[in-house]
């Protein structure tokens, strides 16, 4: 566990305290005991249990670093062991996650030991955010496995939306032939080389594709077919 305080300065400029190094071992022991007891009782749904575990854990912040990642890993462990899909807090939406935690902190209060023993009624704001996140993940999984359109591609958990059909065509051509050249893309698409280069640059910038040192293309986006 941590050996020194790991308080943070929030984006609002105030200092937020987590559990002290002295408190941490006992609070973590309480957390594990509480989790085992709640699982045994079965009064909380898996989503409620995962959300409340996450919040309590975050208020302890038991390690020097990586607490958020470990919290989300434990959430997925709890969800998956109960047959629920795992979730991802995507980088571009991390602010929503942090804001939900902050608003919940305002309700629960600043004392770390109180936060580490919060109940489900106190974390309504974070629970609402968490339930919506799980619901979106379920819908994404359903959309992915039921879609049969070969022109639809996914990246970072969402359908790639673009006005240009050539994006999907380039992805398909690169997947079929990673060594394809700009000249071959131009010929296959029936558009000029400059337009192809602009599309490819946009795709690289968006993270849909990458180029190996040997010049071959790596398609990172995922086709639904």
Locate predicted features:
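FIC/Doc superfamily catalytic core
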Residues: 1-225
């Amino acid at each position: 566990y941590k050996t020194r305080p790991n308080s943070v300065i929030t984006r609002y400029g105030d200092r937020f305290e987590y559990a002290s190094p002295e408190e941490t071992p006992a609070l973590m022991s309480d957390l594990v005991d509480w989790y085992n007891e709640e699982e045994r009782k079965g009064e909380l749904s898996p989503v409620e249990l995962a959300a409340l575990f996450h919040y309590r854990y975050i208020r302890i912040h038991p390690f020097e670093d990586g607490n958020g990642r470990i919290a989300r890993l434990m959430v997925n462990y709890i969800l998956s062991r109960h047959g629920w899909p795992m979730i991802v807090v995507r980088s571009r939406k991390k602010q929503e996650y942090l804001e939900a935690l902050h608003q919940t902190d305002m309700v629960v209060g600043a004392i770390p030991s109180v936060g580490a023993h919060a109940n489900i009624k106190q974390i309504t704001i974070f629970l609402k955010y968490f339930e919506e996140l799980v619901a979106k993940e379920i819908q994404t999984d359903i959309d992915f496995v039921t879609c049969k359109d070969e022109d639809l591609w996914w990246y970072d958990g969402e359908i790639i939306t673009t006005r240009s059909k050539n994006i999907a065509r380039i992805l398909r051509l690169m997947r079929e032939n990673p060594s394809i050249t700009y000249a071959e893309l131009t010929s296959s698409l029936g558009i000029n080389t400059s337009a192809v280069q602009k599309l490819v640059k946009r795709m690289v910038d968006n993270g849909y594709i990458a180029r190996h040192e040997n010049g071959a293309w790596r398609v990172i986006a995922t086709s639904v077919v």
